Regions:
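Phosphate/ribose-recognition catalytic cores of enzymes acting on nucleotide-derived substrates
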Residues: 226-281
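Nucleotidyltransferase catalytic core that binds NTPs
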Residues: 2-236, 245-247
């Protein structure tokens, strides 16, 4: 496995692979990899001949008061994860390699990005769409792998690829959880011991909501109220949003009559965590 920092080198290597008829899988990340990322890399390795993992903390998807400067970074640790999971190249560019000083072109999306995380982080998805488009252009993979924990992001990337006729297959992979149900996240490292215990309230609330739907409840407002009550029982938790939306359009639904995404964002102390489940009727 190699670590590559330049766009030119990644392109040259992928070009060689494709000249030999090899399929290329791609896993874009911001680093500080956990078992969720590892599962994406392993799946990419199983389904492709070669795998590229990008590690780039993308500055343009962070808001002015968000955690860009404190986002955890550990390339040595990440390299070991990538190599053991089957990656062939880590693409680890500097900011200057990805963005010219006078960079002024962005990829934006209407509708799908308005609610959920887009509502409280209004510039986030413009940054995500822009960097993912750039990475797709640089790596030119056959398939790209994203985790379902970031369900809105996955829907946005699928729509972007469709709308812009990008010839890459987008594959969503299941959420990987800790033994107590907390979704794996690089931001879990921010949590104190007390906050880490409190964070289990996210999965507990969603589990109860899923059971309620399975028992026949179809009123979205009742599901939202149930989740709200459970989360508010934890003194360290502060709700950002609780939504029941169409799993494709991300539009709110009043009644659960087709495939829906039940998604939440909750602050545990100062750390914002997200979780979700999809319910298919």
């Amino acid at each position: 496995m190699r670590i590559v920092e330049s766009i030119k080198d990644v392109r040259a290597t992928v070009k060689e692979w494709k000249a030999k008829g090899l399929k290329v899988g791609f896993v874009p990340t911001m680093g500080y990899l956990h078992e969720g990322h590892e599962s994406l890399i392993r799946k990419a390795s199983e389904e492709n001949d070669r795998v590229v993992v990008s590690i780039f903390v993308n500055p343009i998807q962070f808001g002015p008061k968000e955690d860009l400067s404190t986002y955890p970074r550990d390339l040595e640790r990440d390299s070991k994860v990538c190599e053991s999971a089957g990656a062939d190249i880590i693409f680890h560019p500097e900011n200057e390699e990805m963005y010219f000083k006078d960079f002024s072109t962005f990829v934006d999306m209407n509708g799908l990005t308005d609610g959920l995380c887009g509502k409280s982080r209004p510039t986030h998805f413009r940054g995500v769409c822009t960097v993912v488009t750039k990475l797709f252009n640089i790596v030119a993979p056959d398939r790209a792998y994203f985790g379902e924990k970031d369900a809105q992001q996955l829907a946005v990337i699928k729509r972007m690829v469709r709308d812009l006729n990008i010839d890459i297959e987008i594959i969503g992979c299941p959420i990987v959880r800790e033994k107590d149900g907390l979704a794996k996240s690089s931001r879990n490292t921010y949590l104190s011991v007390e906050e880490r215990n409190a964070a289990t309230i996210l999965n507990k609330s969603l589990t109860l909501a899923k059971e309620k739907i399975q028992a026949g409840e179809r009123d979205s407002e009742i599901i939202i109220k149930l989740i709200e009550e459970v989360i508010n029982s934890e003194k360290l938790a502060r709700i950002d949003y609780i939504e029941v939306v169409d799993s494709l359009s991300m539009e709110k639904v009043e009644r659960i009559e087709k495939s829906v995404l039940v998604a939440i964002a909750v602050f545990i102390g100062k750390t914002r965590l997200i979780d979700n489940f999809t319910y298919e009727l």
